[in-house]
A protein has these predicted regions:
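N-terminal Rossmann-like FAD-binding beta1-loop-alpha1 element of flavoenzymes
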Residues: 7-33
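Redox-cofactor binding/interface segments in oxidoreductases and associated redox assembly factors
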Residues: 10, 169, 314
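Glycine-rich FAD pyrophosphate-binding loop
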Residues: 24-49
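N-terminal FAD cofactor-binding segment of flavoenzymes
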Residues: 43-89
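Short beta-strand to alpha-helix junction loop
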Residues: 102-122, 260-262
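Predominantly flavin-linked oxidoreductase catalytic cores and closely associated redox partners
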Residues: 126-273, 277, 337
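FAD/FMN-dependent oxidoreductases across multiple families
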Residues: 233-235, 241-243, 255-379
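C-terminal helical "tail/cap" subdomain of flavin- and related membrane-associated enzymes
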Residues: 343-612, 617
């Protein structure tokens, strides 16, 4: 008799284990088995890459999977992303730095994958999931009708078959189902990587040892806990701390600029490459033997389909992988797993339709993945331009917080409407124009860095978007706020366009720079020959003042004016003083315990209301809206 389950998950990596936990939490009556070739204990540190999370994945791990306490106790907090630009052969402390000074109110984490996956296996087993270890999945035979699918397995020399109503491919880059069904899809993002783990704390702060107290103090928390990036044209090098005490180090390159063959064959070759391009990193690493050494050439790929109404899906790297720069891997796991659970739920309720599954594939593959690839594809040439990459990073974060993360936080991914698809397409089209603008800008403008340290938390628009992730909204409220955010991003795109024109085509700048023409942001480019045919000067939106958004990039493109110093820099400096410059140990304690470990909605309500405005909402605001036993004030976006 072949054992039969409601859900068979092939692969007990991060995607498979988190899916098993999510199914058990949301659909506890279902029987689940997880199959993996590796048996416990898995090695800590030297196990798998993919250690850093951003807000969407952190929400998934912490809130959806109910792992906040575990992550606080067994993993490390993440102090955002940090980038170092400029002359890699000069003094490290003189390199322009982009990174936050304090933890945000929404936690993110540095994950030791070996520790996490060991712990998750134990957790799901205790929840009633059957964890079948030391077992290889040979084939997946999909049923043509309502019969169970069959998974043919092998343990040692013994072969056996398992049956499941649902089967999930979480086998990683093996991509068993995608290969079987002809669903693999290249995406022409030619990038490669090599990485290793060192069994010691490697602190980038030690590279700036000659920077003195001022360099050390400008970041209140410990740089060590950031995902640290050393940036150069066509490459970046990462340093990520792990809870086991080890440090993950990696080299990632554009194949057309730094071929994999120049660094990826061995640890010795990688060290030689570091010595040539990032000597400060080489000095930090050279005395250690690695716990492991891994590499991937041309790591990026897509898929034609990852969900099916015939009761299968591909999650994690079994479906797609884009690029590690902004740690999107766990974000896609969160979205794919949540959609998979929704499909399973509807199936057992008799409500799953082929049309709904088509929408899920369209959402992830045609919109989210297609648009996210634009952050990385052909963009590695920008990394040598501190001011352009800083502008790009702020833009990327704004798009992510304004729409992508909100899709998940507001649970829209489970039931995307036509209006959601329409809005996503508008975001995607605008993002495509701006990303190409950055690429062309970097190709035409000289590299420069008007700043010593930039911190996106000084950008008020981004502050509002980040705080806004703490609000919970209805579907209509989500749509209205997403539209308002799109308006703000349209204004940012106009400012970026005119800055690029000023640097690359100064003869095209209007005489009066204080009143820039309002253009069609969906038609911007650095090719004047296309402006007429693309309708650059025929915007479909009414002119709005750009002044409120102008200070977003204060100090990034040029030293701050006196007005900006008073209006932007002075409040930021006072804010820093109140949170760390004067008494760093006390402020760190208060910040972590009063802000980071709590939703901090009291702080958010100082800036943002919780729902958008409509006539009915406006009337309700006067009296307050009662939700869940609490009275909350008002509505509106940013």
């Amino acid at each position: 008799m072949e054992p039969e389950y409601d859900v068979l998950i092939c692969g007990a990596g991060l995607a498979g284990l988190t899916l098993a936990r999510q199914v058990k939490l949301e659909l506890p009556a279902l029987s689940i088995a997880v199959i993996d070739r590796l048996a416990r204990p898995l090695p800590e540190a030297a196990h798998k890459v993919g250690e850093s999370t951003v807000e969407l994945a952190a929400c998934y791990f912490g809130k959806v999977l109910r792992l906040e306490g575990y992550l606080t106790q067994r993993q490390l907090p993440k102090l955002g992303l940090r980038f170092f630009f400029g002359n890699a052969h000069g003094s490290f402390e003189e390199r322009p730095e982009l990174g936050v000074s304090l933890y945000g109110i929404l936690p993110t984490y540095q994950l030791d994958r070996g520790r996490l996956e060991n712990d998750l296996r134990q957790m799901v087993a205790e929840m009633g999931v059957e964890v079948i270890e030391g077992t290889t999945v040979d084939t997946i035979d999909l049923a043509d009708d309502a019969d169970p699918h069959k998974v043919r397995c092998r343990r040692d020399s013994q072969q056996f078959t398992l049956r499941g109503r649902w089967v999930i491919d979480a086998l990683g880059r093996r991509r068993l189902l995608a290969s079987k069904l002809g669903l693999r899809l290249p995406n022409n993002h030619s990038a490669s990587a090599a990485w290793w783990r060192i069994d010691s704390r490697l602190d980038v702060g030690e590279m700036g040892v000659n920077g003195g107290a001022q360099w050390q103090r400008r970041v209140i928390e410990d740089r060590y806990l950031s995902t640290n990036h050393l940036m150069g044209r066509g490459y970046w090098v990462w340093f990520i701390p792990l809870a086991s005490g080890a440090t993950s180090v990696g080299i990632v390159t554009d194949e057309t600029i730094h071929p994999f063959a120049t660094y990826g064959k061995s640890y010795a070759q990688a060290l030689a490459w570091l010595r040539a391009y990032e000597p400060a990193a080489w000095q930090l690493v050279k005395g250690y033997e690695p716990l492991d050494f891994r590499h991937l050439k041309n790591y990026s790929y897509n898929a034609r389909q990852i969900f099916s109404h015939r009761r299968w899906s591909c999650v994690g790297e079994a479906g797609l992988f884009l690029d590690p720069l902004y740690s999107p891997g766990s974000d896609f796991i969160a979205v794919e797993n949540t959609i998979t659970v929704e499909m399973i739920r509807r199936d057992f309720q008799g409500e799953l339709t082929e049309g709904a599954v088509d929408d899920f594939n369209r959402l992830v593959l045609d919109l989210l993945a297609f648009d996210a690839l634009r952050y990385f594809k052909d963009a590695y040439s920008i990394f040598g331009h501190a001011h352009i990459f800083t502008a790009k990073h702020a833009w990327d974060v704004a798009i992510y917080w304004a729409m992508i993360a909100q899709l998940f936080v507001q649970d829209v991914v489970r039931r995307p409407s036509r209006d959601v698809f329409t809005l996503l397409r508008q975001y995607e089209d605008l993002n495509a124009r701006v990303q190409q603008l950055f690429i062309d800008w970097a190709a035409a403008a000289p590299a420069r860095a008007p700043f010593a340290h930039a911190d996106i938390t000084r950008m008020r628009f981004l502050q509002m978007l980040h705080l806004d992730l703490a609000a919970r909204r209805s579907h209509e409220q989500f749509l209205n706020v997403a539209r308002k955010n799109l308006n703000r991003l349209e204004e940012v795109a106009q400012l970026l366009f005119w800055q690029a024109i000023a640097e690359c085509l100064p003869e095209r700048m209007p005489p009066d720079r204080s009143r820039l023409p309002w253009v069609n942001a969906w038609s911007i480019s650095l090719n004047p020959e296309l402006w007429e045919t693309d309708g650059l000067y025929k915007p479909s939106t009414a002119r709005r003042s750009l002044r409120p958004m102008r200070d977003m990039y204060a100090g990034v493109f040029a030293p701050m004016t006196l007005r900006q110093l008073v209006q932007v820099e002075l409040p930021y400096r006072i804010w820093l003083a109140g949170r760390g410059k004067l008494v760093p140990p006390l402020v760190r304690f208060l910040h972590r315990h009063l802000i980071c470990d709590r939703p901090a909605m009291w702080l958010r309500r100082l800036f943002i209301a919780d729902s958008p405005s409509s006539p009915a909402d406006a009337r309700a605001r006067g009296n307050g809206l009662r939700r869940g036993g609490r009275v909350t004030k008002g509505t509106g976006g940013i």
